[in-house]
Amino acid sequence: MDLKKIAADIPDYQQFLTVDELNDSSHRLREQYPDLVSIRNIGRTRSGDPIELLTVAGGADCAFVFGGPHPNEPIGCMTIEYLSQRLCEDGPLRAELGYTWHFIKSIDADGMRLNEGWFKGPFTPSNYARHFYRPARREQVEWTFPIDYKTLSFNDPLPETRALMRVIDETKPKLLYSLHNAGFGGVYYYVSDECPALYDTFHQIPEWFNLALDLGEPELSFAEPYAPAIYRMLTSNDMYDHLERHGVADPGSVIGFKASSAQYAERHGSFFLIVEMPYFDEPRVNDQSVTSSKRRDAILQAMDIAIEHDNWIRSQHSSVVCELKLDTPVRRALEDFLAMSADFREADREWVLQAEETNRPATQAELFSNLYTSRFYKLLNTGLLARMLRDEIAGGNGSAAVASASAMATVRLDEDGRALEAALDYRAIPIRSLVGVQCCAGLAAAAYLNS
């Protein structure tokens, strides 16, 4: 398998496809390759739309790939758009890999429609934040699988999650590929098991597309690295144990997340892969030069900035909560963020102060993660607040308090967005590069599992 040739063939996509455009494309593919492609409904979304499983027939082993595990993550939808077409066109590749491929292009289609406002550009942090939606924890398809761990017990999956469970149980995939993406930074990976034979390939693939590995702070402080930018897949059990180790009496009451698709697929021995891709990058995301700042101080500074920002959002929300009329997904997402216990942050603060690995000079990448990448994610929360208030006004809420809070949230969103963009030497990464890394990494993993 010539991965570099596959990488070179990926089209220069200029925009993300909407849910309807993705569905239409799947049906055209079936019409074009009726002997290879089948589509069947395996459930319905919460709003009643069909959830379609696209299958490209092949060998006895199964790979199950699903996009949009969080609805603000359409990169994987485009990866499936390309990969499903390529597998149909390329018989030798299909035969060499020896898999039957099952795809769901967008598993949270209802939520993805709420993000489509930025899918056609302009691709800037500010525009992304303005149209951003990521569900409350209880409404996240990827994190509402059943679990029974210590005091964390749950068995009421969302309809979309039940659809994933059904496909995992039917296909027992050798490879389960959940196509997540981050927002800002570099490329990094999660795998369910150590796989040293893949590490060099995983490190090389981003270079083919002029992308950098993310060598700054891990997504969560307790992530276990197998190699630079390659981590063991995190589970809700890990989150629970982290909180428990650092003084939280009952993590099950505050964690919010349930089990993930990776945890559910353990029963079938599936190899699980995530390739986290950013929309935006910056030269400092993998700069390993050492600074004069201590890593511990940088992490604590980022925490203090986050607390100030969270308190501002909380105060804006509390000033109008009695005036709000609509129960929307955006409102539930914002209020879930506000309700999230400070136990997470306090547990991390305790880890920072105790862990010897934080008591050293920070690299430029680590400093960038703490002081700039963190600001990008705070901007998204401001965007949720501004959007919730816009929705209220558009829905006929004439409250003066809501109008005032909406104006203030919009001003802060615009000002913080401009300030962040001015402080960064960022670029919007070409969509073909994002698709390329996910596609090539997935094919490399599939070949590795059958080697």
Regions found by a protein language model. Name each.
Residues 52-60:
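Short beta-strand-to-loop junctions in surface cap/lid or active-site-entrance loops
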Residues 64-69:
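Short glycine-rich or small-residue beta-strand-to-loop segments that form or flank ligand, phosphate
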Residues 1-16, 160, 196-451:
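C-terminal accessory segments enriched in acidic
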Residues 70-78:
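Di-metal (Zn2+ and/or Mg2+/Mn2+) metal-binding site signature of metallo-dependent hydrolases
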Residues 70, 108, 182, 219, ...:
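Catalytic metal-binding/acid-base residues of hydrolase active sites
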Residues 60-62, 75, 87-199, 203, ...:
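Active-site/substrate-binding loop(s) of hydrolase catalytic cores
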Residues 1-51:
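Short glycine- and acidic-rich boundary segments immediately preceding or forming the N-terminal edge
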